[in-house]
């Protein structure tokens, strides 16, 4: 099988052990799955183990119900020297009614690590399709926004001391 190294799809059945007090799937369980999917996508692309640097724009659009299939559609959007932005779209499917819903989206930045647990270089991502190019350009903007936000937070921290 010839799977693209920059994409990954994973489907998981939502079981009763994942519910919150409202009977829906607990957001924390979804966050853990998002991190696992981002790890799998980024590490396969990089050929190295990775660690999570940041989780951006996690948007829970609709509740997820027990018994639904949750499909995670992950793709590498951008690479830095050692970092990889992975975008994930989450689709929920009701097995009985066949209703499919877009329930979550987010972006995770992962950093590739060498055997000495130091950041290591990753292959440059070169978008090919129009969708990949759009996601690549949006990832550059998000990266710039993260840097700007970090600078603002640092100014706030320094002014408090």
Language-model features, listed with the residues they occupy:
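Short secondary-structure boundary/capping segments within folded domains
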Residues: 1-2, 30
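Residue-level recognition of specific faces of alpha-helices
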Residues: 11, 30-33, 57
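Hydrophobic beta-strand-centered segment that forms part of the acyl-chain substrate-binding groove
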Residues: 2-7, 25, 36-78, 83-84, ...
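HotDog/MaoC-like acyl-thioester-processing domains
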Residues: 5-10, 65-66, 77-161
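N-terminal hydrophobic or amphipathic segments with adjacent small-residue motifs
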Residues: 17, 21-22, 61, 111
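A conserved, well-ordered hydrophobic junction motif at loop->secondary-structure transitions
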Residues: 19-31
């Amino acid at each position: 099988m010839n799977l693209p190294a920059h994409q990954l799809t994973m489907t998981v059945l939502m079981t009763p052990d994942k519910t919150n007090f409202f009977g829906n799937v607990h957001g924390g369980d979804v966050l853990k799955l998002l991190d696992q999917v981002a790890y799998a996508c980024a590490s396969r692309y990089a050929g190295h183990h990775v660690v999570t640097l940041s989780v951006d724009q996690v948007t829970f659009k609709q509740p997820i119900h027990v018994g639904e299939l949750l499909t995670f559609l992950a793709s590498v959007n951008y690479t830095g020297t050692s970092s990889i932005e992975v975008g994930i779209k989450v689709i929920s499917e009701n097995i009985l009614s066949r209703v499919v819903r877009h329930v979550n989206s987010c972006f995770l930045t992962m950093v590739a690590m060498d055997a000495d647990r130091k950041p290591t270089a990753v292959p440059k991502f070169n978008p090919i399709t129009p969708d990949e190019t759009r996601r690549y350009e949006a990832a550059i903007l998000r990266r710039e926004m993260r840097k700007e936000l970090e600078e603002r937070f640092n100014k706030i921290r320094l002014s408090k001391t």
